[in-house]
């Protein structure tokens, strides 16, 4: 087994995912990044923009809505690296609509991507961690999974489900030194958010006691705390990083 620690990250190429990968690589981790579809140009551009070497990241083609194929791909990647120390379930989508107007497709797309795929990704990783008798899993939820959000019944349900899943899995993993936690970000200055109109951003910031969006680095730092030696006595918890938008 390699001495280098390995982290599997879903949604690795997104705004928050990229920063999580950056901080993990800086801490000495090898990254297994799930992607669909494989796009060599995009992957190379991402590696260059993040300052990564090819050896820092193993890209794995995983259509997370194809359970058998995705499971096999993840198992193959873990076998190739010989270990997996950290899992960050970060992939997620939105399909916003009021519940009255929400289609079954909009509901299913979000539940399947944000919640159902947790089983597909986590089970092969969790089983390897049980074998190793160690591991850290961090699931990325959302402030809206805690408080709910108008027009996001599907998204809020999926992100709340992540929290319940985490609490249950934390109890199963504890005896094998596997810590399972949630990071629940508030509004974060990812490219998708900062591309919104300035007046929309200002209206969001006005609702936040700290009067600003989170930086992706602040979300990633919370993840890094939970996977570090300093987070070794934390499990089944939800770490809210929302600037005071929701206090509970």
Swiss-Prot record:
Reactions that this protein is recorded to catalyse: a (3R)-3-hydroxyacyl-CoA + NADP(+) = a 3-oxoacyl-CoA + NADPH + H(+)
GO molecular function (one): acetoacetyl-CoA reductase activity
Residues given in the record as NADP(+) binding sites: 14-16, 42, 90-94, 185-188
Residues the entry annotates as binding substrate: 96, 149-152, 186-187, 197
Entry's localization field: Cytoplasm
Metabolic or biological pathway, per its Swiss-Prot or TrEMBL entry: Biopolymer metabolism; poly-(R)-3-hydroxybutanoate biosynthesis
GO process terms (BP): lipid metabolic process; monocarboxylic acid metabolic process; poly-hydroxybutyrate biosynthetic process
CDD domains assigned to the protein according to its UniProt record, in alphabetical order: BKR_SDR_c
InterPro entries, sorted: Acetoacetyl-CoA_reductase, NAD(P)-bd_dom_sf, Sc_DH/Rdtase_CS, SDR, SDR_fam
UniProt entry keywords in alphabetical sequence: Cytoplasm, NADP, Oxidoreductase
Record-level GO cellular component terms: cytoplasm
Main location: cytoplasm
Top-level taxon in the UniProt lineage: Bacteria
EC id: 1.1.1.36
Active site: 155 (proton acceptor)
Enzyme class label: oxidoreductase
Record-linked NCBIfam families: AcAcCoA_reduct, PRK12824.1, PRK12826.1-2
Annotated family: Belongs to the short-chain dehydrogenases/reductases (SDR) family.
Name of this chain's protein: Acetoacetyl-CoA reductase
Organism classification: Bacteria, Pseudomonadati, Pseudomonadota, Gammaproteobacteria, Moraxellales
């Amino acid at each position: 087994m390699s001495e280098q620690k390995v982290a599997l990250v879903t949604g690795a190429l997104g705004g928050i995912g990229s920063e999580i990968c950056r901080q993990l690589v800086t801490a000495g981790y090898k990254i297994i990044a799930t992607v669909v579809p494989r796009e060599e140009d995009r992957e190379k551009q991402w590696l260059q923009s993040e300052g990564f070497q090819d050896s820092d990241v193993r890209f794995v083609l995983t259509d997370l809505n194809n359970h058998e194929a995705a499971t096999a791909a993840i198992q193959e990647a873990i076998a190739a690296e010989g270990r997996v120390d950290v899992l960050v379930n970060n992939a997620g989508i939105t399909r916003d609509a009021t519940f009255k107007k929400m289609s079954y497709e909009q509901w299913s797309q979000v539940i399947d991507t944000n919640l159902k795929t947790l089983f597909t990704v986590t089970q092969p990783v969790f089983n390897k961690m049980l074998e190793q008798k160690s591991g850290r899993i961090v699931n990325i939820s959302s402030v809206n999974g805690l408080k709910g959000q108008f027009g996001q019944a599907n998204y809020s349900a999926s992100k709340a489900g992540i929290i319940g899943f985490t609490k249950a899995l934390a109890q199963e993993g504890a005896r094998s030194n596997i810590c399972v936690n949630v990071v629940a970000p508030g509004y974060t200055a990812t490219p998708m958010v900062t591309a919104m109109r300035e007046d929309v951003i200002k209206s969001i910031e006005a609702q936040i006691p700290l009067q600003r969006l989170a930086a992706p680095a602040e979300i990633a730092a919370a993840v890094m705390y939970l996977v570090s030696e300093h987070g070794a006595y934390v499990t089944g918890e939800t770490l809210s990083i929302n600037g005071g938008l929701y206090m509970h």
